[in-house]
């Protein structure tokens, strides 16, 4: 992986818990990626 692909947090699942975890991590300044199996 290149430096631009690095994350501090990877959240698997966009349900209620994953959604809150991803938002909180981003608010704390962590580079965050959320992965969801279903498209929108």
UniProtKB/Swiss-Prot annotation:
Assembly, per entry:
Homodimer.
Q: Which cofactor does it need?
A: FAD
Protein name in the entry: Dihydrolipoyl dehydrogenase
Residues noted as binding FAD in the record, renumbered to the chain: 36-40
**Can you tell me where the transmembrane regions are?**
none
To which protein family does this belong? Belongs to the class-I pyridine nucleotide-disulfide oxidoreductase family.
Keywords, ordered alphabetically: FAD, Flavoprotein, Mitochondrion, NAD, Oxidoreductase, Redox-active center
Q: Which Pfam families match?
A: FAD_oxidored
* Catalytic activity line of the entry: N(6)-[(R)-dihydrolipoyl]-L-lysyl-[protein] + NAD(+) = N(6)-[(R)-lipoyl]-L-lysyl-[protein] + NADH + H(+)
Q: Where in the cell is it found?
A: Mitochondrion matrix
The EC number on file is 1.8.1.4
Q: Which GO terms describe its cellular component?
A: mitochondrial matrix
Cofactor detail note: Binds 1 FAD per subunit.
What extra comment accompanies this record? The active site is a redox-active disulfide bond.
Q: What does this protein do?
A: Lipoamide dehydrogenase is a component of the glycine cleavage system as well as of the alpha-ketoacid dehydrogenase complexes. The pyruvate dehydrogenase complex contains multiple copies of three enzymatic components: pyruvate dehydrogenase (E1), dihydrolipoamide acetyltransferase (E2) and lipoamide dehydrogenase (E3).
Extract one GO molecular function annotation from the record.
dihydrolipoyl dehydrogenase (NADH) activity
Q: Identify the species of origin.
A: Solanum tuberosum (Potato)
């Amino acid at each position: 992986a290149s430096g631009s692909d690095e994350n501090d947090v990877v959240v698997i699942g966009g349900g209620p818990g994953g959604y809150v975890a991803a938002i909180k991590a981003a608010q704390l300044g962590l580079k965050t990626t959320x992965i969801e199996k279903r498209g929108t």
